[in-house]
Design a protein with these regions (language model features):
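Nucleic-acid endonuclease domains
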Residues: 1-50, 64-297
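Active-site beta-strand termini and strand-to-loop segments that position acidic
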Residues: 53-57
Length: 297
C-alpha cells in the first residue's frame, strides 16, 4: 500500500498502480472464466487496504508485488519457478488490522514490469510516443494537512509559452477522491474555487517545458514545480503471475516474521515488518477457482 511501501513518492505510486492493475486483471480473469465474484467497491489510493473482491462470500485480499529489475524479469521469463523460493509477504500491521476474518483469502500475485523512472528514460518514452502518465506529488503539508479544513481558493500559474492542461487530484471533506481538470493559458494564472481539503498530486498529459506554480490563498503557501519535477508512474507490464493462495487462518498458522530491512526477492530492503510463507507452500489458484465453482469454499 502507498504509505507503508516506502521509497520515493513516485516509486510508491508505481507500486500502487501495479496493485490496481493486478486487481482489475484478476476481475477480468474471473469474468472470462465465468467464476462468480462480488465487487465491494474499488479501493481508493487513500485507503488501499479496503478490499474490492469477494469470492464465495469471503474477502479476497490480493497481495501484489511489482518486479521492475530487468535481470529479475528476464529470470522469471526463463525460469518461472524462480518465484517458488520467494516469500509471500503480508505487512504485519495490515494483517493485524481490525475488520479481518480468519476466513479471508490472501491471494499472492507478481507483476513483472519495467518502469521509466529517470528523466532520461522519461524523455525517451515521450519521444517514442509510448504510453506515459506524468505526475508531480505535492509536499506533505498539501497532501496531509494538520487540520482537515478547506484549502480555500487555489491559484495556478504557468510560465509556458503554450496552454497546458492539468488534472489536480486530492480529497474532499469526506476524504473521497476529488479530481479537477483545468486549462492554464500561456503565462497566465487561473483561480480554482474551494473544492479540496487536501491536494496530493498534479497530472500533466504532456511534459511541461516551464515552471508551474500553485498557491493556497488562505494559507498564503506557494509551491513551484520545475520542468524536471515530474515522474512517470506508468508500469510497462504485459502479464501477471497468480502465485497461489491461503486462508488468513492458515497463513497466520504457517507464517514466520520477516523484519524491516531484510533483503527478499521482491525488495532490496523491506520497509516494514512482514509475515511470510514461502510461495512454494501456497495452494494453487486453480484449486481456489474449482472450490468456488463447486460451492465448497
Amino acid at each position: 500500500t502507498y504509505h507503508r511501501a516506502g521509497g520515493s513518492p513516485y516509486s510508491r505510486l508505481r507500486r500502487t498502480v501495479a496493485g490496481v492493475a493486478v486487481g482489475l486483471a484478476f476481475r477480468r480473469y474471473l469474468s472470462e472464466r465465468n467464476i462468480p465474484f462480488d465487487v465491494k467497491g474499488a479501493a481508493p489510493f487513500t485507503n488501499p487496504d479496503r478490499y474490492d473482491v469477494s469470492l464465495g462470500g469471503r474477502r479476497c485480499d490480493i497481495q501484489s508485488f511489482l518486479i521492475s529489475h530487468r535481470e529479475q524479469i528476464s529470470e522469471m521469463k526463463r525460469n518461472p519457478q524462480v518465484i517458488l523460493n520467494a516469500p509471500a509477504l503480508v505487512p504485519s500491521d495490515q494483517n493485524a488490522a481490525e475488520g479481518h476474518s480468519d476466513r479471508d483469502i490472501y491471494l499472492f500475485a507478481f507483476l513483472p514490469g519495467l518502469v521509466a523512472a529517470s528523466q532520461e528514460e522519461m524523455r525517451k518514452v515521450v519521444a517514442a510516443n509510448q504510453p506515459h502518465y506524468l505526475v508531480h506529488v505535492l509536499p506533505d503539508s498539501w497532501m496531509r494537512p494538520a487540520a482537515w479544513n478547506p484549502l480555500g481558493a487555489l491559484v495556478v500559474k504557468s510560465e509556458a509559452e503554450e496552454a497546458i492542461t492539468l488534472e489536480l487530484g486530492g480529497q474532499d471533506e469526506g476524504r473521497e477522491t476529488r479530481l479537477l481538470e483545468v486549462e492554464i493559458p500561456p503565462r497566465k494564472r487561473v483561480e480554482i474555487p474551494n473544492e479540496f481539503f487536501s491536494l496530493a498530486r498534479i497530472h500533466s498529459k504532456a511534459p511541461p517545458n516551464a515552471r508551474i506554480g500553485i498557491r493556497n490563498m488562505s494559507e498564503n503557501e506557494a509551491h513551484m514545480i520545475g520542468a524536471f519535477d515530474w515522474g512517470n508512474i506508468w508500469v510497462y507490464g504485459m502479464e501477471i503471475v497468480l502465485a497461489g493462495f491461503l486462508s488468513r487462518e492458515e497463513f497466520n498458522r504457517r507464517a514466520t516474521p520477516v523484519y524491516e530491512g531484510a533483503r527478499v526477492f521482491q525488495y532490496e530492503k523491506t520497509r516494514v515488518k512482514n509475515l511470510a510463507v514461502s510461495v512454494v507452500d501456497l495452494k494453487p489458484v486453480a484449486e481456489l477457482f474449482e472450490r468456488i465453482k463447486e460451492h465448497t469454499l
